[in-house]
Amino acid sequence: MSAAPPRLVVGLGNPGAEYSETRHNAGFWFCERLADTLGVRFSHESRFHGLVANAREAGVWLLMPQTYMNRSGQAIGALARFYRIAPAEILVVHDELDIPPGQLRLKFGGGLGGHNGLKDTSAHLGTNDYWRLRVGIGHPGDRNEVVNFVLKPARREEQTLIDESLDRALAAWPTLAKGDWNTATQRLNARPAPPKPPKAPKAPQPAAADQPKDESQP
């Protein structure tokens, strides 16, 4: 397992306002949050087919491909080759059908889970051996509904859970930036604790004037 810190963080998604709030753009959502945290702005780089930000102090590039999901690897491969970034130094953040909203999975290499953005990324990098942060969006329950599902906005309660998971991922960024992948994996892959139920309000105590008098005394 790679121990090198990431030099390139990629958020997968589709360009355009019509896709900006759809489940498939979860990777973009994380990259936008990370750019805000690092104090950098994206600009379009035609040679890299995407929106690019250079966080020099953090030593990391941020990339949001503008090639549409199924051709994400074109952008990733172009930037990685130009700056000589090894696949093991790349973190790809993407939506994941097989994980419920609110949960995350950090993994290195392995299968692609049928994700077209990952398939194209692996094709252009020539390997599956790069880091992925899988952002749970849930599954519609019917494989025939998957395309329609990922290209629609999440329900309000689901979006709240997804946003909370992205906040947890952002909180783990300092650990990721150091290349401490083991600690980050343990932290991000743990299921979030369920919210504690609110405490029942205490019954009001009667005021002293309302207390019954003791008639046994003379």
Curated annotation (Swiss-Prot):
The record marks 14 as: Discriminates between blocked and unblocked aminoacyl-tRNA. It holds the Pfam family Pept_tRNA_hydro. This is Peptidyl-tRNA hydrolase. The record marks 95 as: Stabilizes the basic form of H active site to accept a proton. Gene3D superfamilies: Peptidyl-tRNA hydrolase. One of its GO terms (molecular function) is peptidyl-tRNA hydrolase activity. The keyword RNA-binding applies. It comes from the Bacteria. Hydrolyzes ribosome-free peptidyl-tRNAs (with 1 or more amino acids incorporated), which drop off the ribosome during protein synthesis, or as a result of ribosome stalling. Catalyzes the release of premature peptidyl moieties from peptidyl-tRNA molecules trapped in stalled 50S ribosomal subunits, and thus maintains levels of free tRNAs and 50S ribosomes. Belongs to the PTH family.
